[in-house]
Regions:
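Feature marking well-ordered beta-strand scaffolds used for ligand recognition
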Residues: 1-225
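Soluble extracellular-acting proteins and domains
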Residues: 186-298
Length: 298
């Protein structure tokens, strides 16, 4: 994000970075930050309209001002997909605009936790980059009921299972995700085992990985497939029971060839031929995770 536009560079050779594409948007006032998804196939730009000091989330404000712009990266080029702005209108007394955030490492999903100054905090699902959705939020309300005092979340960052929100006036808030219709216990558990490296700097964005054959990762994929209606509940129950049996073997540091073979069989049953792109990706990742889990207990 370069204030007046968004630019993508090829940094394969860090000593000779090459500019390969750039985008302009007349609705963007100040291109403030850019965050890639973990696969590096998408980028989310934030527009800090007015430098973050003014109300820009009132009912009268356009939903594409002071918002995010989400682009897919296709053959090295940026292709616009959608805007996202927090859906809850704010008052004249609340400075509100898109600001700093970071990826929430749930496997199989592209999630971003974002600060909106006095607009609070949003967790955004942009797995479908053309249809981003808010799946969680927190909002303290205005610092003062009658006049605008600069405040709110400057940044919200995920680290080691928690979200840290730096509130300009009211200090540091620490959050955990709650189970909901849009976030399962298994997804939260899978995010907690993500490896972000020994040090975390959201501006560097090192690739996040998960332990091979981790039961919570497998169950997270199953939950996602059920939620998107790509897997019947009856099938999901069989997958969950088998993965849970494997998890018990791991907890007891034991082996079980029968459960291992069942995991391999379930992996081979996954058919992506009729699945959409997102479901197919999750099935493929689930298949790999089941095979890795099978090897761990064989």
């Amino acid at each position: 994000a370069c204030s007046g536009n968004g630019v993508i560079f090829d940094i394969s050779d860090p000593y000779k970075p090459m500019r390969i594409d750039d985008v302009l948007d007349q609705k963007f006032a100040y291109w403030h930050s850019a965050t890639f998804n973990n696969d590096g196939t998408k980028v989310l730009f934030t527009d800090e309209w007015g430098g973050g000091s003014r109300p820009r989330c009132r009912p009268s404000d356009p939903m594409d001002w002071g918002a995010n712009a989400i682009y897919d990266i296709v053959d090295g080029k940026l292709e616009f997909r959608s805007y996202f702005k927090l859906p809850a209108p704010q008052s004249e007394q609340e400075n509100c605009v898109a600001h700093n955030g970071s990826v929430v490492p749930v496997p199989g999903r592209d999630l971003f936790v974002q600060a909106w100054y006095q607009g609070g905090m949003s967790v955004i699902d942009f797995t479908d980059s053309a249809n981003p959705t808010e799946i969680a939020y927190f909002d303290r309300g205005p610092v003062h009921e009658e006049k605008l005092i600069l405040g709110g979340y400057w940044s919200t960052y995920w680290y080691d299972g928690k979200i840290y929100g730096t509130e300009i006036v009211r200090g540091l808030d620490v959050f955990e995700l709650n189970v909901s219709d849009m976030m399962s216990e298994n997804e939260i558990a899978a995010a907690a085992v993500a490896d972000q490296g020994a040090l975390f700097n959201p501006q560097q964005q090192f690739v996040v990985t998960w332990p091979k054959g981790d039961p919570s990762v497998a169950l997270a994929f199953v939950d996602q497939l059920v939620r998107s209606e790509a897997m019947p509940q009856s099938d999901a129950t069989e997958y969950a029971e088998t993965v849970s049996a494997a998890a018990q073997e791991l907890a007891e540091n034991s082996k079980n060839r029968r459960v291992s073979n069942k995991l391999r069989s379930l992996a081979s049953d996954l058919d992506t031929s009729d699945a959409d792109a997102i479901a197919a990706m999750r099935m493929t990742e689930l298949k790999t995770t089941l095979q890795d889990l099978a090897r761990r207990i064989r």
